[in-house]
Amino acid sequence: MTRTQKGKTFLPHCFYQSLPPRLGWGMILNYSKLKGKEECASVSSVPMVFFSSQYRLHRKSQYLKMAAANLTFSQEVVWQRGLPSIPYSQYSFDHLYNTNDIIHTPQIRKARPQKPVSFKFLGSSSPLTGDTSLAVKTESSANPEKKLKKSKPASTVREAPRPLIHHPCMHPDMLGRPPSLDVNLEEREAWLLPPEKEARAWEATVLEKLNERTARWIQSKRPRRPGASPNKWQSFLRQQYDWSHIRDELTSASDLELLKQLEAEETAEFEDQSVILPPQEKKKPELLLPVYYRLPSYFQQAETVEIMPGNKSTEDIHEKTSLSQPQTQSYFRQVTPRAGKFAYSTDNTFEQEIYFDEVQIIHQIGAKRDQIVLENLNRYNKQLSKVFPETPEKWSAQAIPEASYRPVQGALRWTALPTPAKDMLLQVGEKDVPIKTRRLKKQAKSLQEDVTWELVVLRRMLKEWKTAWALIIEWHHETVENLLQSLGDLHDDVRIKAITTCATAALERPRIATSQRDSDKTIQDLPEVLLPALEAALCDKNAHVRMAAAICQYAIQSHNPLARNIMQTALLKGNSVDSWAAAQCLALEGTATYPVIKRILHQLFTKKNEDTEEQSYILLSYLSEKTTLIHTMLAVELNSCQWKNRIVACQAFSRISGNVCLDMKHKLIQLMWNDWNKEVRRAAAQALGQMSLGKEVHDIIRVKLGQGNSQERVEALYLIGELKLMTAKLLPSFLHCFSDDFTAVRRAACLAAGALQIRDKMVLECLLNLMQRDPYWKIKAFAIRALGQIGQVSPELTDLLLWAIHYEESPGVRLEACRSILALKLQGDRVRDTFLDVLLLENHDAVLKEMYQTMKILNLGNEGNQEMLQEIKNRIKTLSQKDLLTHKILKLEMVMGKVREEAKRVYLKPKGEQGPLTLQTLLQETFQDEMVLPRRPSEVCDTEAVIKPVKPRAPNPWLQSSVPGLTTRSKVRSSLVKDLRTSPEKRIAVGPFRSDYPALYLGKFSERTFFSPIMSSPSGKKGAHL
């Protein structure tokens, strides 16, 4: 063994030669057969011999078997390479909760004192290795579990594993620990074998290809120990990347100064030295589009810098700036630019909002005294002067509860203008507590947009175009710099999206003018910086980009001729989406050509929603003032075979303006009277009314209503209801239709009166007359409906409606009466009592449902005489029982028979002044002392149960004989079988007194036969007496 100058121990070279050769994956195998020194030397020194493939596979399999025979791994190796083989109970999840890799802390690597290298030999009797030791444990890996729990920060870089160093003069069965990593490369390379030197030759190649920054970074991770000689990395950096190599080639003084600055930056970066850099220009914050449009609820905030581990420059910037601090610099704004130097201008955000944007200040109860809250929820901190002596909250160590808000006399002086508060938004976990606000003396005027119809059309056009191409645009978060960069992007879709964002912002920005001063302000639709890029997009090689740029030019209303040419090309050759957008843009510009009108009419006749229909009508109405081509093309559609096209053409005539020729008037009148479709006739009549052609229609209706047949009168009345047309000349003929002989005419007159809602006395009298005296129930129902639509309430109408709902036989009339009461909102005790009475007797489901709904809406509660009504219902239910009614009827028959027999058989002397016996007196005397109690359900007689014993039994098929007509059991004659005897035979069987055979009375079984002896008792007595 030898000892070096530094006191480290090394083994002799002979011990190294006794070790077996290494495998490809860096593992040492100890062969028991190779024990001699010569054999070991021969293995390490003999050059490589190429064997056959089969022999190599055979040897490879033997090596694998021998290597895996008693192979064991340390715990640290298992944790690093064999995690799937570790049981779940032994696995540690501490590294999941380690935050060192999220927030990196710079660590300073301290030099450790040198320690002598000591070698420990593990004998063959080691419990881990057995006969052969295959694992090597160093002192640093003595406690692998502790090192695994303590995770390293992400900023540290692990050193690459170095090949195992073989030491000489070691026993073949022993494994030694490699020397310390701090040993110089020169000393380690002195005893390396040639194969090891060749294996390490890759370092020279790697060092040649490393750049300066990577080499210096590696050097910074392995700092030189104090007192030690410079290592190979430091010498490599000096030789490879020394600035003195290029210093002689520089000639200008500026280049030399730049070289010194670069050297100082590198020194500060890798040796932690502070360098005073020249002041740099502060980066100007990007301008948001809402800030450009001066929206009151937007203001710029300071730009935050992303922090990277180890980057001290960004950390210093982060320490100086705040995340929630608003911008410190703001552009100046003036009240009226025309005032020149006499106008007030300011760059304070608070003054700009309250003076220029006219945002009101909200005085909140319980708010902070040092803050100002505006209508847009922006908060500003007051810059107040200090108050002496200071309050206890400043110098007290204990927390003092916040007192309730109380008025304070006096006000503190402002030392500066208010600044935006940092806590503009609620902090995490803070609740938004509603605060009572004082009522302002003057209510703020509602802000309404001052938008022209051209702008509305452009907004709708752009919205439809974006929806068709599935473009989702959010312009409130875009900046001018970002849009300018996107306009020059390489990809077409990025340019299209940027152009569409510009067009959307120009059209959708708020246009609120609350005063004359605001109306004088001129804010361009887009910043001047973006206009050249947008104009350049008109010459883009992509057709979609050019189309988007043309739409943007029309959005800002620049009247660019190149954009007009693009739109005309898209109108003729483009797809349906682009051609429809082009037609709208060209129509807004006043281009009333045949292709534009044809495309608009095509979109109108194939419309899919109401917005498209409204857009088409607006454009056609605007173009109709410039040309008559629209009326000509619509007149062609009036002769279309499709009734829907005729309706659209009539509606278009009623919406557009312009002069209409006489032929079109006659065509519309013809459609109004003779078209087979009801909707077409209605649309034609409305078109004539909207086109100021009411006189011609009025004269025709007057003639047909007074001199036409029944069908013409019905059509005339229908048109009167549709057009809402009634004059003094039409009224006499209209009143005569209420008494017409035809039902259809009277029905049409009621419908027209309800549609016109005429409150004329004569019309109301005609409707009341139909309601009372018309023989057809439908006419009564239509008259009642017309009275409900007119809404004229009178006592006579109330009486007639209540009478109709109570006594009319037709359910339809009662239903319409109930609906008219609801329409007229009739209330009161009389109405409620009538409804309650009708509910007891009404049996129609529709009428009952309508009555319940009417009572619920009119709040006609069921309080009234509910107790009395319930008692009446219970009494009726009790008296309506079948057995009680049968008993009363039989008793009444018995009494009447007795009275009849007494009058026939017994002579009674008449009494003076005694009137004849009436039915009412007879009923009172018969049922005077009788009390009827309501029965329980169990006491009610079950008729089926009573009749069941006397019913004939059903034949049993198993007891019948196979021979038809023969049965095993004789048929039992029942008393319910029809008696086939004649009347003389029945009288002979009954006898002269009809009391011997009561069961044969009337020839059938009935309840009446049970009382026959009682009823025939007078005759029995008479027979006995005779």
Swiss-Prot record:
Q: Which UniProt keywords apply?
A: Repeat
Give me the HEAT repeat coordinates as residue ranges.
530-568, 724-760, 761-794
Q: Where is this region: Disordered?
A: 135-175
A molecular function (GO) term: oxidoreductase activity
Q: Know the name of this protein?
A: HEAT repeat-containing protein 4
User: Which species is listed as the source?
Assistant: Homo sapiens
